[in-house]
Every structure is written in C-alpha cells, then in structure tokens.
C-alpha cells in the first residue's frame, strides 16, 4: 500500500499567533502554506482578514488567499477541492505542505472530505435569495428555526447566504443540514497529518483579540469597508457578513454608532475565538502547543518529515 502524502497543520483561534509560528517553520523545511481561513479567500477583504503581508508571501508562497471576488459563492466544498489540488501539486514538486488557519471546517474538509448529501439546486437557491431580498433574511431565519433549529441557532439572522444554503439542503433532502453534518463521520484522510493547535490562556487571548480589533481599525478597516460598499458589494453578501465587515457596515449604514460597533466587534471576535477552541478540542490527534514552543514543533516536524 503506497504511503500517504504528508501535511503539517498549524491551527488555532483568531489572534493566537499562528502565522508567526507557521511562516518560519514552513520556510525552514522548504514548504509552502495553504491558508485555511474563510475570509482570506475573498479579494479586497484585506485588513479584516488579517492576511499575511506581501513580504511574508514573498518569503514563503501562500495559497488559498484572494481566490474569489466578494460577491462570488464560496464554501467548504469548493475550498476542499481547490486546496487538495494545490496540495497534490506541491507534493509532486517535492514541496512540504503546511496548512495554517483557524477555520476548522475548512481544515476538516481538506483532510477528511465533506458529507455528500448537501446537494444544490440553483433555481431553488435563486428563489430563496429573492425571498430573502423581498422579506428580509430574518423571515427566512424564522423558517429555518422550524425546519432546522440547530442550524438556526448557529447561523446569524443577518447571514442570508448561510440561511438560504441550510434551507436549500433541508428542502432538497428532507433532512436538516445540522443532522446530516452530525451523522457524517467523514472519510479516512488521504494524508498523513501532523496536527498542531496553538493555545493561550483565555484572558491573554482575549486581550490579543481586542488589540487586534484596535489595530485593524487603526489600519483603515472602516475605509476598506466603505470602498467595498461603494464598489457595489452590499452588506447582505456572505463575505460582508464576516466579523468586522458586518460591524462596520452596520455603523456606516447608521444601524449602530461607532462605539457600539467596535464593542460588538470585539465581543464577536472573542466569541469566535472561543468557538474555534471548542471546535479544535474535538480532534483527538491534535498536539497542543503554546506559540513560543517553536523548538518543540520544529523537532516533531523534523521527525515527521523524515
């Protein structure tokens, strides 16, 4: 039986310091980085996604960043297909593959695949989107509460994209999307994986996420969002529902004052970090590391890649 191709994953919650660990390790071992971040795939969403700078990308090639425009459809299925193709190309070129990110569902999709019952119907999807435009996403969210309460609890009432997708799966399959995901055991991974997850004390992590928000605002997040809106990328788009972009849209459109928008942005960033930690704790194969344990990670990677 042929040996599996090897992948090193360095995951963790937002603000923990993943890139500062992954970049030097990938460079040292002759690797390239596949990003696993649900916001970084969108072009023009730069500050709020905290994308690596061009100098970092010059030092180590990064993939799955700036893949689609803000108004294009993108999900974990698309991510998995594209990321797996990149991983195969890198392996064929004798490059080491490093995966860096905090979007656990994308990482799981890359490593293990996704459930296949979530079929799609473009006509049904367009109909649901028109309904959302006419009645508002909250009306569809109420409908989702009846058909799939767990998904409704997980999805924000303003997130029209995810609401319509969950409804589409419910209608097409007759089963809640949440039940299908829970029942799916995922396929055996085609990769041999060394999986690290970085962690910090909760209070320190939350201090860092608050500082991260302040830094994004100082870098011009509001101006970036205004530019996106002026270019026709509306608040209803999936990309614009991301943390930071959603809050600045609400401020710019008058739904929130600036102080409240910033307060909610910090709160929601902390909540995201907490959810991400909960997600990664479900992986029994993870090696938990503090961000400053670079030498320990280096030793394990060296042994793994031999």
UniProtKB/Swiss-Prot annotation:
GO terms for biological process: tRNA modification. InterPro entries: Dimethylallyltransferase, IPT, P-loop_NTPase. It comes from Desulfatibacillum aliphaticivorans. Catalyzes the transfer of a dimethylallyl group onto the adenine at position 37 in tRNAs that read codons beginning with uridine, leading to the formation of N6-(dimethylallyl)adenosine (i(6)A). This is tRNA dimethylallyltransferase. Its EC number is 2.5.1.75. ATP binds at residues 12-19. The keyword Transferase applies. One of its GO terms (molecular function) is ATP binding. It catalyses: adenosine(37) in tRNA + dimethylallyl diphosphate = N(6)-dimethylallyladenosine(37) in tRNA + diphosphate. It is an enzyme of class 2 (transferase). Belongs to the IPP transferase family.
């Amino acid at each position: 039986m042929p040996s599996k191709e090897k992948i090193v994953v360095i995951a963790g919650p937002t603000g923990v310091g993943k890139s500062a660990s992954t970049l030097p390790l990938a460079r040292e071992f002759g690797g390239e980085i596949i990003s696993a971040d649900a916001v970084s795939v969108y072009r023009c969403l730069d500050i709020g996604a905290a994308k690596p700078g061009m100098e970092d990308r010059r030092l180590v090639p990064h993939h799955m960043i700036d893949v689609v425009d803000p108004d294009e459809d993108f999900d974990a299925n698309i991510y998995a297909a594209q990321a797996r193709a990149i991983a195969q190309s890198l392996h064929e070129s004798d490059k080491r593959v490093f995966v860096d990110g905090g979007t656990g569902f994308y990482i799981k999709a890359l490593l293990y695949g996704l459930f296949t019952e979530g079929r799609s119907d473009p006509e049904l999807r367009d109909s649901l989107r028109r309904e959302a435009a006419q009645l508002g996403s909250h009306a569809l969210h109420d409908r989702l509460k009846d058909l799939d309460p767990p998904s409704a609890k997980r999805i924000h009432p303003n997130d029209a994209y995810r609401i319509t997708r969950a409804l589409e799966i419910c209608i097409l399959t007759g089963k809640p999307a949440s039940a299908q995901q829970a029942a799916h055991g995922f396929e055996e991974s085609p990769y041999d994986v060394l999986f690290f997850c970085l962690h910090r004390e909760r209070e320190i992590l939350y201090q860092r996420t608050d500082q991260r928000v302040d830094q994004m605002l100082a870098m011009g997040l509001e101006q970036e969002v205004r530019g996106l809106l002026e270019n026709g990328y509306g608040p209803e788009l999936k990309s614009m529902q991301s943390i930071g972009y959603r809050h600045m849209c609400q401020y710019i459109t008058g739904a929130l004052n600036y102080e409240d928008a910033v307060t909610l942005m910090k709160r929601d960033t902390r909540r995201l970090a907490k959810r991400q930690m909960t997600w990664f704790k479900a992986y029994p194969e993870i090696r938990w590391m503090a961000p400053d344990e670079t030498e320990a990670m280096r030793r394990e990677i060296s042994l793994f890649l031999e």
